[in-house]
Amino acid sequence: MTSIGQLRSQVASKERSAVEVARQYLERAERLDTEVHAFLRLTPERALAAAEAVDAKIARGEDPGLLAGVPVAVKDNLCMVGIPTTCASKILENYRPPYESTVTRRLEEQGALIIGKTNLDEFAMGSSTENSAFGPTRNPWDLGRVPGGSSGGSAAAVAACEAVASLGSDTGGSIRQPASFCGVVGLKPTYGLVSRYGLIAFASSLDQIGPFTRTVEDAALVLQAIAGHDPLDSTSLAVNVPDYRQALISDLKGVKVGFVKEFFAEGLDPDVADAVFEAIEVMRDLGAQIQEVSCPRFARGLSTYYIIATSEASANLARYDGVKYGLRDREADALVPMYGRTREEGFGSEVKRRIMLGTYALSAGYYDAYYLKAQKVRTLIKQDYLDAFAKVDVLVGPTAPTTAFAFGDKVSDPLSMYLSDIYTIPLNLAGVAGASIPCGFDAKGLPIGFQIMANALEEGKLLRAAYAYEQATEWHKRTPALAAEALTR
């Protein structure tokens, strides 16, 4: 699979035109997606127009951008002017945004070719992409298994080589967990480093946009393109974005690495544990100083998250009432029944479940007992991570307790599904950075993810650790059979 750097070089040197690249990937995505269903729609007109603009810049001798000629897919909760943006929900099935998300604008300013919008769990609520109103995405490594979620389509598109990179959103693990399940790199940046303007909100204090790629270097390049302050997002951090490529060093001499002991307790699959411990030993061989670190309030993370996230979701999703945009029930004879029937028809069962949980947590008489208490525990969880990062440069552990599970295995057991994110959720509560990189395969031949975590705005440390590990191993070079076959055509 061609990397971002290689592809940009080929396009910039006129070895290949950006238009040629766009057509190649659009054709491949159309062919492979009959099996994978990573995309909800392809955007050929937009991609080809962007490709023509890149080729024109090169012909004029201008800098075509950091991502010139690179086919990128974006999760379908990121707004693009005039292109249906559904959040994989019937309530937004025909919604065409009148404005552009900051991240898609920045991608195209750097020469990226946005080839399509990817599938997700409805409103990014789920861990398997089974909650999409438009059908599930399949894991390219085993079409009978889930790709993870909620950004399952974005992860599967990169794993299947339908796109060189993609964007997802991560509220409690929705980039890192599918990256683990699909055997790709997934990066959740520090909260506020990447603008959320144009991201349709799930839980506003937790949501963050980040890239999926096949290599750590490619993730650094995409992050470079999309990071930075945005006056359109009041939560965007006013910080200078460093050159993340300078962090890509292939040794870990002097780097302090802490493994979180609470991540290795009951519930962790033995194959996953073995692969992660082997990855830690590789880091030791690269010169890292390894030590055990404790995050004592780890066990409170899941319940804290599901109070805060659902509370914010119930408020954010109150706007979908059939009045201004989206689905509207046409049979109701009064306003209040129209509200109810619109939401009943438009929302799926998991979204309704989370709205009800959040509404309950915010209701009079329960606000202090649930929501306010959860916010206090969130502060304590954040302090756990601050204390840990005072001792080490990065933390490591498994991304998910298991590898990809079969379709239907957890649908009837929401708690079991929620536990898929038990190792990723605390980072969103703390607002720090995390990434999942491939570190092996289980006995069934399914990918295993290795989670590397760094303090807020220390993506450079995270990328250095991830890059050094990646360069010492071969896991990122493995490709699913269906993608390998497509690449030979």
Swiss-Prot record:
Q: Which GO terms describe its molecular function?
A: ATP binding; glutaminyl-tRNA synthase (glutamine-hydrolyzing) activity
Q: Does the UniProt entry include the keyword Ligase?
A: yes
Active-site residues, record numbering mapped to chain: K75 (charge relay system), S150 (charge relay system), S174 (acyl-ester intermediate)
Q: Name one GO cellular component term.
A: glutamyl-tRNA(Gln) amidotransferase complex
- Look up keyword Protein biosynthesis and say if it applies: yes
UniProt keyword annotations, A-Z = ATP-binding, Ligase, Nucleotide-binding, Protein biosynthesis
Which Enzyme Commission numbers does its entry carry? Answer: 6.3.5.7
Q: Which InterPro entries match?
A: Amidase (IPR000120), Amidase_CS (IPR020556), Amidase_dom (IPR023631), AS_sf (IPR036928), GatA (IPR004412)
Reaction catalysed by this enzyme = L-glutamyl-tRNA(Gln) + L-glutamine + ATP + H2O = L-glutaminyl-tRNA(Gln) + L-glutamate + ADP + phosphate + H(+)
Q: Name one GO biological process term.
A: translation
Protein purpose: Allows the formation of correctly charged Gln-tRNA(Gln) through the transamidation of misacylated Glu-tRNA(Gln) in organisms which lack glutaminyl-tRNA synthetase. The reaction takes place in the presence of glutamine and ATP through an activated gamma-phospho-Glu-tRNA(Gln).
Instruction: Spell out the subunit comment.
Output: Heterotrimer of A, B and C subunits.
The UniProt entry's sequence similarity note says: Belongs to the amidase family. GatA subfamily.
Name assigned to this protein: Glutamyl-tRNA(Gln) amidotransferase subunit A
Q: What organism is recorded for this protein?
A: Gloeobacter violaceus (strain ATCC 29082 / PCC 7421)
